[in-house]
């Protein structure tokens, strides 16, 4: 990765391709420093350094730009005005301490319901703001190399990649695993256990109606804004109901009615977190509901401070405290939707039954652990090495696959060179040929991920059938959405690919991809699979928020980050089911260490991981 791009990324700035080509030679020659460039961008109130800003910066330093480069990389006229307007808007949002989002001011409908309860920083008792350690993430520029131009994109871990048009080499020869045939070991007898499963929730079960616009000629942008308005209203309504089930939460008041509350009356407000800032005396939140917006101060000595510090933008939370007529809500308690401390126990099962959890197979990748996966298929067919494993495999009835089943096409710059199967149709055919070796008495549940042929934004209803047709034809396969809830013998398994982990890692200091169980716990506490709008995870403009965890599951399975982990939080088993892809060259460069070919075995009765199979020796 180029030194200039990487250094700016660490400083929280993005460099467009046009700016890169204007600046890189001067930077390498030592004609300016990174500090000078960052200070200049900061003075302009922008976080994206484009060609126009780069040219202005070079003029400021008295450095020339060749005419042919100037014509190629600097915009003029209307285009430049749009760029400045866009960046000024974004800078204004960042100064407010928030993340660019529809819910915090762009939705006119929400504004018109009640006037905002606003305040100024000076009114918060002279609290001195300090530089926040809470990252707001980075924007992603997706131009996909149109007209042969390079673009800056971020990979799944948030690192920028300089895109260059790929040169497609000679046609590749590859296997689609048509000759792979693995038969059941006749010396092992599968236990006859009646299957008991139900797809309790699937995105396709929900009939979503498009939002209404004021007139029949409504523009596409207006429709999308209305859809996001409906989405945030849906989220607030669902999570508010969950919060009100907490016996500690009482005397709930709408934000728009706080002016009618006496200063000595303790009340509770519930709303979306628009922004969060750290001060030398505590945290300042901007919280919004359908009736208004208010500033909330939580002191540093509060027992809930650490939990509040970890909350993500756009999460729904509750504060208990007192409202000042100066326009500040002084909180003494903070609540997340969270998981109840006590839940009703499920009745025991008559027979032991097991489920296998895997994800991120990445068929088609050069780093796909083919030998390890074949060994896994042999294991599923009873080719085991101990009596203990024989007892387990004879009782395995379910295989759950949580997305990224193939490596995909055009997912990231330069991917073609990383593929052994460069055809998306053939990738799914190869996958189907492999999964055809899963014994028929094992039911497979297969959902999509961001590498799959499916809607890029979450939730993902299913695979695109025209590409993934071969896996739809598997007799013992059930295609599910991302997310989905599967009920196995009365136990609820929440299955999601896990992209929301990215935002948690970006916003919460101390959490990493290397231990994904902890970010998964934070998502469960917030009862949402991807709370932050405008972060690293694209969220579809559906009129209902289907990413809310409305009912507490017995087990949560995710993947995406390629690292195995398993933790239990308040009786809920959380599992990240790792990957079947070995470490790629890019992962080596950024010190991402996957744990491939590790397979958790779950006892369905207890919904707990009881064994982890390790096939990494063949990877």
From Swiss-Prot:
It catalyses: DNA(n) + a 2'-deoxyribonucleoside 5'-triphosphate = DNA(n+1) + diphosphate; Exonucleolytic cleavage in the 3'- to 5'-direction to yield nucleoside 5'-phosphates. SUPFAM superfamilies: Metallo-dependent phosphatases, Nucleic acid-binding proteins. The keyword DNA-binding applies. Residues 78-122 are annotated as: Disordered. One of its GO terms (biological process) is DNA catabolic process. Its EC number is 2.7.7.7, 3.1.11.1. Residues 79-93 have a biased composition (Basic and acidic residues). GO terms for cellular component: DNA polymerase complex. It comes from the Archaea. One of its GO terms (molecular function) is DNA binding. Keywords: DNA replication, DNA-binding, DNA-directed DNA polymerase, Exonuclease, Hydrolase, Multifunctional enzyme, Nuclease, Nucleotidyltransferase, Transferase. The keyword Transferase applies. InterPro entries: Calcineurin-like_PHP_ApaH, DNA_pol_delta/II_ssu, Metallo-depent_PP-like, NA-bd_OB-fold, Pol2_small_arc, PolB_N. Heterodimer of a large subunit and a small subunit. Belongs to the DNA polymerase delta/II small subunit family. Possesses two activities: a DNA synthesis (polymerase) and an exonucleolytic activity that degrades single-stranded DNA in the 3' to 5' direction. Has a template-primer preference which is characteristic of a replicative DNA polymerase. This is DNA polymerase II small subunit. It comes from Pyrococcus abyssi (strain GE5 / Orsay). The gene is polB.
């Amino acid at each position: 990765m180029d030194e200039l791009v990487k250094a700016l990324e660490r400083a929280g700035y993005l460099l467009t391709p046009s700016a890169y080509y204007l600046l890189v030679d001067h930077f390498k020659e030592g004609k300016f420093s990174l500090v000078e460039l960052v200070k200049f961008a900061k003075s302009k109130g922008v976080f994206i350094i484009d060609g126009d800003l780069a040219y202005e910066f070079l003029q400021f330093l008295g450095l020339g730009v060749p005419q042919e480069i100037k014509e190629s990389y600097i915009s003029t006229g209307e285009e430049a005005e749009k760029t400045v307007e866009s960046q000024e808007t974004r800078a204004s949002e960042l100064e407010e301490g928030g993340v660019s989002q529809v819910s915090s001011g762009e939705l006119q409908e929400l504004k018109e319901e009640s006037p905002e309860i606003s305040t100024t920083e000076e009114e918060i008792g002279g609290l001195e703001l300090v530089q926040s350690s809470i990252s707001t993430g980075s924007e992603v520029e997706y131009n996909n190399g149109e007209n042969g131009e390079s673009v800056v994109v971020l990979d799944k871990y948030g690192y920028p990649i300089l895109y260059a048009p790929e040169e497609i080499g000679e046609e590749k020869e590859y296997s689609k695993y048509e000759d792979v045939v693995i038969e059941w070991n006749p010396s092992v007898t599968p236990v006859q256990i009646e299957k008991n499963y139900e797809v309790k929730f699937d995105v396709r079960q929900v009939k979503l109606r498009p939002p209404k616009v004021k007139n029949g000629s409504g523009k596409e942008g207006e429709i999308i804004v209305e859809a996001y308005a409906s989405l945030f209203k849906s989220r607030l309504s669902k999570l508010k109901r969950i919060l009100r089930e907490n016996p500690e939460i009482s005397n709930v008041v709408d934000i728009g009615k706080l002016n009618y509350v006496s200063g000595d009356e303790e009340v509770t407000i519930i709303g979306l977190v628009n922004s969060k800032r750290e001060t030398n005396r505590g945290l300042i939140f901007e919280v919004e509901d359908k009736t208004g917006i208010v500033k909330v101060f939580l002191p540093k000595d509060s027992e809930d401070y650490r939990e509040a510090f970890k909350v993500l933008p756009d999460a729904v939370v509750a504060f208990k405290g007192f409202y000042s007529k100066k326009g500040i809500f002084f909180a003494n308690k903070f609540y997340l939707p969270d998981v109840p401390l006590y839940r009703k126990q499920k009745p025991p099962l008559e027979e032991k039954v097991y489920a296998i959890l895997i994800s991120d197979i990445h068929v088609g990748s050069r780093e796909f652990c083919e030998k390890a996966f074949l060994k896994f298929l042999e294991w599923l067919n009873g080719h085991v090495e101990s009596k203990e494993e024989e007892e387990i495999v004879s009782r395995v009835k379910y295989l759950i696959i949580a997305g990224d089943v193939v490596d995909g096409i055009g997912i990231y710059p330069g991917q073609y060179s990383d593929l052994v199967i460069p055809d998306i149709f053939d990738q799914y055919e190869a996958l189907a040929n492999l999964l055809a070796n899963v014994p028929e008495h094992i039911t497979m549940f297969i959902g999509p991920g961001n590498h799959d042929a499916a809607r890029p934004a979450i939730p993902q209803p299913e695979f695109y059938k025209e590409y993934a047709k071969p896996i739809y034809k598997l007799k013992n396969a059930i295609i599910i959405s991302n997310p989905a809830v599967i009920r196995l013998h009365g136990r609820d398994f929440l299955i999601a690919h896990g992209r929301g982990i990215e935002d948690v890692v970006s916003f919460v200091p101390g959490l990493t991809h290397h231990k994904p169980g902890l970010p998964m716990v934070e998502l469960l506490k917030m009862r949402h699979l991807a709370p932050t709008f405008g972060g690293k995870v694209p969220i579809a403009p559906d009129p209902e928020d289907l990413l809310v965890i409305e009912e507490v599951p017995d087990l949560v399975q995710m993947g995406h980050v390629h690292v195995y982990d398993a933790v239990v939080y308040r009786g809920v088993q959380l599992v990240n089911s790792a990957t079947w892809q070995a470490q790629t060259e890019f992962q080596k460069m950024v010190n991402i260490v996957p744990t491939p070919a590790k397979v958790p075995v779950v006892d369905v009765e207890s919904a707990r991981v009881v064994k982890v199979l390790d096939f990494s020796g063949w990877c």
